[in-house]
Structure formats: structure tokens, C-alpha cells
Amino acid sequence: MKTPAERIRLLLLMSIAMPVAWATWSALLNNFVVEKAAFTGAEIGILQSLREVPGFLAFTAVFVLFVLREQTFAIVSLAVLGLGVALTGLFPTEYGLYFTAVLMSIGFHYFETMKQSLSLQWLHRDEAPQLLGRMIAAGALTSLLVYATLWLLFEWMSIDYVWVYLLAGGVCLGMAVYMRLSFPVFSSDSTQTMELFLRRRYWLYYALTFFSGARRQIFVVFAGFMMVEKFGYSVSQIALLYLINHVFNYLFAERIGALIGRIGERRALIIEYVGLIVVFTGYAFVNEATLAAVLYVIDHLFFALALSLIHI
């Protein structure tokens, strides 16, 4: 049995719209807050902590579903994400950035929760792996195009942050409006259970997920901010670094998956965490910009390894 084409098209559009806004926001953030709001490590830490609050509260999505259908909720969340990104450049102050980051994060985390749920419900089991791979590829290609565009805009045109945030957020918001107006509300082939489940036997998975989240914040928050504040990386250089990361991920992701299949999850985890000890120790003592960039790329490869382990 085949998945209806309209459902696939909607999921693909969602997979494209989200990284237009998210990739722009994340790539520009560190340079923007340092140049326009004079952020230090303390302020960026507060901003990123506030940004994670909606992620922690993503379980509250089950309560919203008593009021909104999942498809509608996903599109509304995508629109909120786009709005938060569009407003970011207009509020270059400490509290303004806190507000827009939280607004963006609310849309992002609710959207990701709903999109994953819709994908599992709409895609037929025999087609799901291929179609999920297609959606991941669409999102990755969109991110690559965004980073390449950012590099061109800031390297050759010196465009202002405000217009880039407005453009990226506006595109995401516009795509959300298009999805709402152009697609019917699809029915689900499965019944959605409005409950949360925790199982004691999964405690190790919960613990590893917790530590993985903490490690991810070091990569997302500290490492990128260090590249800007300590080594003076420009927006175009950061965009280029993100571009390199995604190219490396594209080239090595399949090999990483094959490696895990050969050596097993246990050894893969040992390799990941030993490697991270070396990388984070390097972050503490590195004083050369190129070496810091190399550590950043290696860090991203270990992050790809962690993602592969999570999805096994």
C-alpha cells in the first residue's frame, strides 16, 4: 500500500521550510549577539538556557492536541518558528534576543514533535525508511543551500542582519501559510494515544539521552560562540564552517553507520566519548583559529556518530 502523494508532498515541504529559518538563525546568532548586543559567555548561556525551556516542555504538546489537530498544530508551530526568526534582527538587545529566541524555540520544538508524529502515522511501514531518508536529504540540502547563500551574502554583499533574518523567517512563515491554505486536513490511519510513557527498563537510554543533550549544548552553545568571541570568525567564515560540517556529514554519515554495524553500539559509544574528551580538552587550550576549526569539524563528526547511535 502506497502513501498518498499529497501527504508526502506536505511532509517534504515541512522538511524544507524548517531549516530555512533554523539554519539561518543558528548560523548568524553568535556573530549577531556579539556585534549588536555585546554578549559575553554569560548572556549567551542565559539565552541558550531559555531557548531549551520549550524543548523541556515539549511534552505539553499532548495537551494542545485536545484543541488542535496535529497537522494544524505542526503548521502553526512552523509559522511561530518563522515569526521568531523574522523578528530576531529587529530586537538587537539582551531581553529582545531572549524573547525572540524563546518564541523561535517554541515553534521549533513543537513543530519537530508534531512532524515526527505525523511521519510515523502517515507513512506506510514498507515505504517509511525510504521516505524518511528523502525528507532528511531534503532538509540537509536546504541547510547546505542556506549556508552557501549566507556565505555569499556576507562575503560579497555585506548585507545587514535585519534583512537576512526577515527574509529567512518570512520564507518559513510564508511556506506555513501556503501549507495551511493548499492542503486539506488529512485523516490518520492510526489512533493517536494522548499519554506519556516512561519505562524503568529504558533507564540507560534515558541517561544516555540526558548526557547527549548536555554534550550537544557544549557543541551548539560554547564551541560556536568561542569561534566568534575568541578567534574573531566573521559571519561568512562561520557559514563556511557550517557548510564544511554538512559536507563532511554527507560524505561520512553512511560510513559511520557501517562502522557502528561492525563494531557494535558499546564500542562506538566508547570511541565517541573518548574522542569528545580529547576534543573538549583541545577547546580548553587551543589558541590557533585553524586548529579550533578542525576541532569543531571533528566535534561535528562525533555528533553525527551520536545521532546514528540514537536512531539504531
Name each region found by the language model:
Residues 106-137:
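Cytoplasmic helix-loop-helix junction between adjacent transmembrane helices
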Residues 310-312:
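Conserved small/polar residues in nucleotide/adenosyl-binding loops
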Residues 58-70, 154, 252-265:
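Helix-to-loop junctions at the C-terminal end of transmembrane segments
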Residues 27-43, 221-238:
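Short amphipathic helix-loop junctions that connect adjacent transmembrane helices
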Residues 150, 169-188:
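C-terminal membrane-cytosol helix-exit motif in multi-pass small-molecule transporters
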Residues 73-86, 267-282:
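Structural signature of the two symmetry-related core transmembrane helices
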